[in-house]
C-alpha cells in the first residue's frame, strides 16, 4: 500500500512537470524582497537558516515550482534580460518560499537580484530601482560540494509522541516524495508525512537510534536513498544531524522538447 502511495505521488509530480518542465528555459518576470525579515519567514519553514543557503541567494517561487513544499530546496539559475544592466550568467537561487503573486514567477532576495547585474560600480543599485525585471530561468542541480544531506530535528519534536524533521543541503535536481523511519536494525518501517513546506512529521516515534530512507524522483521513477548515519537514541530538538549520504540524482521529466535553451 505504501509503495502504491509513493507511485501516486511520483506520477503526480511528473504530471505537474509536464506543465512546468523545470529543465526548460522559462521566460517571466522577477522582483525582490524589500524587507530582509521576510527571508526568514518563508513557507518552506527554513527560518533564519534560509539566508545561509547559497550565500543568501534565495527565492520565493510560484505554486507550480513550490509544489506544495516538494519544491523547497530546489535550485534555479536566473538572469535578467536588460542587456544594459544584466550580466549573461545571472545567479543560482534556492527556493525557500511560496510566491502567490500573479505578477512574477520569482521573488528574489535583494542579494540575488543584485547578482544579476553587470559587474560595474553602481549598476546593481540601479537594477534594484527597476523593482520588477524580465528574466529567464531554468532548474539546475543543487551542489553543496562535499557536504552531506542533513536532518534537522524541529523544536516541536517531543519523545515519544512526535518527531518533526526537515532536510537541509539536499543536492541534485529532484524532489523527496517520501520519508520512512525505523529503529536501527529493524525492518519495521513507518512513514512520515509532509507537515508543511520542507517539514516532515510523525506521531509514531520508534524508540532508540533511528534510521531513515528517502524516496526521491530519480530518473523516470522513484528511487530509495538510505541514510548511512542514524539519528542517535538521545536525539534533541533543534539539533542538526548528518545523514551520511547526499542526493545527486536528476529527475528525468516526461515533457516535450524545450522551446528555448540557455545560451
UniProtKB/Swiss-Prot annotation:
Q: Name one GO biological process term.
A: anatomical structure morphogenesis
Instruction: Show the PROSITE patterns listed in the entry.
Output: EXPANSIN_CBD, EXPANSIN_EG45
List each copy of the Expansin-like CBD domain by range. Answer: 161-243
Which GO terms of the cellular component aspect does the record hold? extracellular region; plant-type cell wall; plasmodesma
Question: Glycoprotein among the record's keywords?
Answer: yes
Keyword annotations for this protein, in alphabetical order, are: Glycoprotein, Secreted, Signal
Signal sequence coordinates: 1-20
The entry's localization annotation reads: Secreted
Question: Boundaries of each Expansin-like EG45 domain copy?
Answer: 41-147
Matches recorded under InterPro entries: Expan_Lol_pI (IPR007118), Expansin/allergen_DPBB_dom (IPR007112), Expansin_CBD (IPR007117), Expansin_CBD_sf (IPR036749), RlpA-like_DPBB (IPR009009), RlpA-like_sf (IPR036908)
Q: This protein's superkingdom?
A: Eukaryota
Q: Does the keyword Transmembrane helix apply?
A: no
| SUPFAM superfamilies from the UniProt entry | Barwin-like endoglucanases, PHL pollen allergen
Residues bearing attached sugar chains per UniProt: 99, 102
Question: Where is it chiefly localized?
Answer: secreted
Stated family: Belongs to the expansin family. Expansin-like A subfamily.
The protein's name: Expansin-like A3
Which species is this record about? Arabidopsis thaliana
Name of the gene this protein is made from: EXLA3
